[in-house]
């Protein structure tokens, strides 16, 4: 949600921010609507005052046993006027709210202009692409040949975009999640949290998933939502709160199942585990004071990078351009892993600073020196477990189809150093 007071002060600047995302100007119309709303509220207050005065006068006349018919008629007229003004103010407010709810976050000045992912900027590359003496296979070729990645059974059970992992691959998935949690909790101070996988409308709206992304999520018959990411319950845990200043920063992490309908993804990544309806992800969320937001964004991104570095996965950090930055983000870094089997860079983490965009939607504040102020919220993947497993499989594959286990994962694998 946006600050209407700031918008009123400079609607042209607001429209310029929207233009960076390729959106049409709405600032002046919002200001005009807000002026109409304020005028209706002022007239409403005046009419309510007049009606209150008439009520006193009617009471006085009745005590004196005098005729009140004329004044009561005025009171009835005022009642109807008040109802009309209330309806007008509410109608305008709803119109303003509907527009504001539909508008994405304003981008940071440091976000480069651009229309899509081809115009994202490489910040740095870590590691070297492994050279193979054989033709590297894709993860699903490796997994199926080992008999440990079963798509037909998953399709029988649930349809497309699901997988059944067996044996050592199932254990590898679990090991990766545990390794991520251990890294983030012991080295970066995130508090491990177990969260519900079902949330209500308020949690989804507050974390900018509703109304825009309703089609991308699964809704149950009782109106709750399967979480598309643990960002939703972690961030929404401070919804409606006024936090003590000394409680910040709050850093939380959760390893959870995530559920996405993948609406609009028909024909994309149909083979393998890259794009699924259900997947495991280690999520990072920070709640901070506004002045600490930029440093926290860098810290969070480095935490995600640390996992990739320890695993020996070649990756690059990308600064997303205006046209590729998500709806709720002011600035986003993506981490893309090199997949030798695909011969392509693929997103494995996305770390975003939403500034106070989510906080305004959630009414999440802290006790600042001059009164309650909105917190800043940040979220990031630390990492997507399935995609990290894909990177491990393709990076550490051998010519015979076996897969070496990265050294840091071996304690989580009972000392196993190779699959296959």
Curated annotation (Swiss-Prot):
GO terms for molecular function: ATP binding; serine-tRNA ligase activity. Its EC number is 6.1.1.11. InterPro entries: aa-tRNA-synt_IIb (IPR002314), aa-tRNA-synth_II (IPR006195), aa-tRNA-synth_II/BPL/LPL (IPR045864), Ser-tRNA-ligase_type_1 (IPR002317), Ser-tRNA-synth_1_N (IPR015866), SerRS_1_N_sf (IPR042103), SerRS_core (IPR033729), tRNA-bd_arm (IPR010978). Pathway: Aminoacyl-tRNA biosynthesis; selenocysteinyl-tRNA(Sec) biosynthesis; L-seryl-tRNA(Sec) from L-serine and tRNA(Sec): step 1/1. Keywords: Aminoacyl-tRNA synthetase, ATP-binding, Cytoplasm, Ligase, Nucleotide-binding, Protein biosynthesis. CDD domains: SerRS_core. The keyword Nucleotide-binding applies. Signal peptide: none annotated. Transmembrane segments: none annotated. The keyword ATP-binding applies. L-serine binds at residues 229-231, 283, 381. It is found in: Cytoplasm. It comes from the Bacteria. ATP binds at residues 260-262, 347-350. GO terms for biological process: selenocysteine biosynthetic process; seryl-tRNA aminoacylation. Homodimer. The tRNA molecule binds across the dimer. Belongs to the class-II aminoacyl-tRNA synthetase family. Type-1 seryl-tRNA synthetase subfamily. Catalyzes the attachment of serine to tRNA(Ser). Is also able to aminoacylate tRNA(Sec) with serine, to form the misacylated tRNA L-seryl-tRNA(Sec), which will be further converted into selenocysteinyl-tRNA(Sec). Consists of two distinct domains, a catalytic core and a N-terminal extension that is involved in tRNA binding. This is Serine--tRNA ligase. It comes from Gluconobacter oxydans (strain 621H) (Gluconobacter suboxydans).
């Amino acid at each position: 949600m946006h600050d209407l007071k700031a918008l009123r002060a400079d609607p042209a600047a607001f429209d310029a921010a929207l233009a960076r995302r390729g959106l049409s100007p709405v600032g002046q119309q919002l200001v005009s609507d807000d002026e109409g709303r304020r005028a209706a509220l002022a007239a409403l207050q005046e009419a309510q005052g007049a009606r209150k005065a008439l009520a006193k006068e009617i009471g006085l006349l009745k005590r004196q046993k005098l005729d009140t018919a004329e004044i009561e008629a005025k009171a009835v007229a005022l009642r109807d006027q008040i109802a009309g003004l209330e309806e007008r103010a509410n109608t305008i407010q709803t119109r303003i709210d509907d527009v504001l709810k539909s508008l994405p976050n304003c981008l940071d000045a440091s976000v480069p202009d651009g229309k899509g992912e081809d115009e994202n900027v490489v910040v740095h590359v870590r590691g070297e692409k492994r050279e193979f003496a054989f033709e590297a296979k894709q993860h699903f070729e490796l997994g199926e040949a080992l008999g440990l990645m079963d798509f037909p059974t998953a399709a029988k059970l649930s349809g497309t975009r699901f997988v059944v992992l067996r044996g050592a691959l199932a254990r590898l998935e679990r090991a990766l999640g545990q390794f991520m949690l251990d890294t983030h909790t012991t080295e970066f101070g995130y508090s491990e949290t177990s969260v519900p996988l079902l949330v209500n409308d308020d949690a989804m709206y507050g974390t900018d998933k509703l109304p825009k992304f309703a089609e991308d999520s699964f809704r149950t018959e009782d109106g709750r939502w399967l979480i598309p990411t643990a960002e939703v319950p972690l961030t929404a845990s401070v919804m409606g709160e006024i936090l003590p200043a000394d409680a910040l920063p709050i850093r939380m992490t959760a390893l959870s199942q995530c559920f996405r309908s993948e609406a609009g993804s028909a024909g994309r990544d149909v083979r393998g585990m890259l794009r699924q309806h259900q997947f495991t992800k280690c999520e990072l969320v920070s709640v901070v004071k506004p002045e600490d937001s930029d440093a926290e964004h860098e810290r969070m991104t480095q935490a995600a990078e640390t996992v990739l570095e320890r695993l020996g996965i070649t990756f690059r950090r990308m600064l997303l351009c205006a046209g590729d930055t998500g709806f709720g983000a002011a600035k986003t870094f993506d981490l893309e892993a090199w997949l030798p089997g695909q011969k392509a860079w693929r997103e494995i983490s996305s770390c975003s600073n939403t500034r106070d965009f989510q906080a305004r939607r959630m009414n999440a504040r802290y006790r600042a020196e001059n009164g309650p102020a909105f917190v800043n919220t940040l979220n990031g993947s630390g990492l997507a477990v399935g995609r990290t497993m894909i990177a491990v499989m393709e990076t550490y594959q051998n010519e015979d189809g076996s897969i070496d286990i990265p050294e840091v994962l071996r304690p989580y694998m009972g000392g196993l150093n190779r699959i296959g």
